[in-house]
């Protein structure tokens, strides 16, 4: 499975442009499991007798906002796993239950953040605030009195406070520096179409990791762009350097409509990647798995 993230989403909070609830792919948070026990937080008992557990209503909200301000002072000492823990709970407070689709297959870091948020399920905002505050207190037992002085001085970005947010700002790509893969990622159908029709770009051109435009379009969920590429004879079964086809990407990202589009266009669901995984084995969607099996089953 790909563990790189060559693309990143532009939203400063969590990615995907104007969508404030999709994790982006800024500076990596680190590897390992997404479970809290593996975030270096086992010593943080969020149900213990922390002062925040006794707070309610406005008092708890004020303590939470204060803790969010204090995070800026902890960036150099907290691990990326701990920042991820805080990120998930901040999102739970500000947005609620994870309500976005899984990030793109290339977007490894975004998937980690998305998974951390999603695993909180129906956790209440109150519990998320308490756990957030408890974690910050554990990281900074003495507390930071400076936070109250500067609260309101900076606009909060919605990514766990200004400090956490600053780690994930996407570097803006100047127009003159963009390549065809950037336009594909942006779903700039007009530009991609002109580049292909004018022969400026081969529809099957690959990036440094062997990913074709079709891989990128499927990864980002751009159905219309996928259709355009197929109409221009994109190699539907092209494999990247890890042996993954566009069908692997669409399946892993759980874009059911694109999976169906690819299958109807002749994509081969029996192709395995270098790890021996079929497209149906890289998705968590039972509906997509079922669809893939229908096309894999011998006809007779």
Curated annotation (Swiss-Prot):
<feature type="repeat" description="ANK 1">
    <location>
        <begin position="209"/>
        <end position="238"/>
    </location>
</feature>
<keyword id="KW-0677">Repeat</keyword>
<feature type="compositionally biased region" description="Polar residues">
    <location>
        <begin position="284"/>
        <end position="293"/>
    </location>
</feature>
<keyword id="KW-0963">Cytoplasm</keyword>
<keyword id="KW-0040">ANK repeat</keyword>
<keyword id="KW-0539">Nucleus</keyword>
<feature type="repeat" description="ANK 2">
    <location>
        <begin position="242"/>
        <end position="271"/>
    </location>
</feature>
<dbReference type="GO" id="GO:0005634">
    <property type="term" value="C:nucleus"/>
</dbReference>
<dbReference type="InterPro" id="IPR000582">
    <property type="entry name" value="Acyl-CoA-binding_protein"/>
</dbReference>
<feature type="compositionally biased region" description="Basic and acidic residues">
    <location>
        <begin position="147"/>
        <end position="157"/>
    </location>
</feature>
<feature type="domain" description="ACB">
    <location>
        <begin position="60"/>
        <end position="145"/>
    </location>
</feature>
<dbReference type="GO" id="GO:0000062">
    <property type="term" value="F:fatty-acyl-CoA binding"/>
</dbReference>
<dbReference type="GO" id="GO:0005737">
    <property type="term" value="C:cytoplasm"/>
</dbReference>
<dbReference type="InterPro" id="IPR035984">
    <property type="entry name" value="Acyl-CoA-binding_sf"/>
</dbReference>
<keyword id="KW-0446">Lipid-binding</keyword>
<comment type="function">
    <text>Binds long-chain acyl-coenzyme A molecules with a strong preference for unsaturated C18:1-CoA. Does not bind fatty acids. Plays a role in protein N-myristoylation.</text>
</comment>
<feature type="binding site">
    <location>
        <position position="113"/>
    </location>
    <ligand>
        <name>an acyl-CoA</name>
    </ligand>
</feature>
<dbReference type="GO" id="GO:0008289">
    <property type="term" value="F:lipid binding"/>
</dbReference>
<protein>
    <recommendedName>
        <fullName>Acyl-CoA-binding domain-containing protein 6</fullName>
    </recommendedName>
</protein>
<feature type="binding site">
    <location>
        <begin position="87"/>
        <end position="91"/>
    </location>
    <ligand>
        <name>an acyl-CoA</name>
    </ligand>
</feature>
<dbReference type="Pfam" id="PF00887">
    <property type="entry name" value="ACBP"/>
</dbReference>
<dbReference type="InterPro" id="IPR014352">
    <property type="entry name" value="FERM/acyl-CoA-bd_prot_sf"/>
</dbReference>
<dbReference type="InterPro" id="IPR036770">
    <property type="entry name" value="Ankyrin_rpt-contain_sf"/>
</dbReference>
<feature type="binding site">
    <location>
        <position position="132"/>
    </location>
    <ligand>
        <name>an acyl-CoA</name>
    </ligand>
</feature>
<feature type="region of interest" description="Disordered">
    <location>
        <begin position="270"/>
        <end position="300"/>
    </location>
</feature>
<feature type="compositionally biased region" description="Low complexity">
    <location>
        <begin position="1"/>
        <end position="19"/>
    </location>
</feature>
<dbReference type="Pfam" id="PF12796">
    <property type="entry name" value="Ank_2"/>
</dbReference>
<feature type="region of interest" description="Disordered">
    <location>
        <begin position="1"/>
        <end position="43"/>
    </location>
</feature>
<dbReference type="InterPro" id="IPR002110">
    <property type="entry name" value="Ankyrin_rpt"/>
</dbReference>
<feature type="region of interest" description="Disordered">
    <location>
        <begin position="142"/>
        <end position="162"/>
    </location>
</feature>
């Amino acid at each position: 499975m790909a563990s790189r993230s060559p693309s990143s989403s532009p939203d400063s909070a969590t990615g995907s442009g104007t969508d404030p609830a999709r994790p982006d792919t800024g500076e990596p948070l680190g590897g390992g499991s997404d479970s809290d026990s593996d975030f270096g937080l086992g010593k943080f008992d969020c149900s213990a007798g922390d002062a925040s557990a006794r707070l309610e209503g406005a008092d708890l909200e004020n303590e939470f906002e204060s803790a969010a301000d204090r995070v800026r002072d902890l960036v150099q000492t907290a691990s990326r796993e701990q920042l991820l823990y805080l990120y998930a709970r901040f999102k739970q407070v500000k947005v609620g239950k994870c309500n976005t689709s899984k990030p793109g297959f290339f977007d490894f870091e975004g998937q980690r953040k998305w998974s951390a948020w999603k695993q909180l399920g129906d956790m209440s905002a109150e519990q998320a605030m308490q756990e957030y505050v408890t974690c910050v207190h554990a990281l900074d037992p003495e507390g930071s009195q400076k936070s109250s002085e500067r609260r309101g001085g900076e606009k909060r970005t919605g990514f766990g406070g200004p400090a956490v947010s600053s780690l994930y700002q996407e570097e803006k790509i100047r127009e003159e520096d963009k390549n065809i893969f950037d336009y594909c990622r942006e779903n700039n159908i007009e530009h991609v179409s002109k580049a292909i029709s004018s022969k400026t770009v081969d529809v099957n051109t690959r990036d440094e990791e062997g990913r074709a435009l079709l891989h990128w379009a499927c990864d980002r969920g751009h159905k219309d762009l996928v259709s355009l590429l197929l109409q221009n004879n994109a190699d539907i079964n092209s494999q990247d350097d890890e042996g993954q086809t566009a069908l692997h990407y669409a399946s892993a990202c759980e874009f059911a409509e694109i999976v169906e589009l690819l299958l109807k266009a002749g994509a081969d669901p029996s192709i395995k990647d270098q790890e021996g995984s079929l497209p149906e084995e890289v998705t968590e969607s039972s509906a997509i798995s079922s669809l893939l099996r229908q096309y894999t089953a011998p006809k007779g």
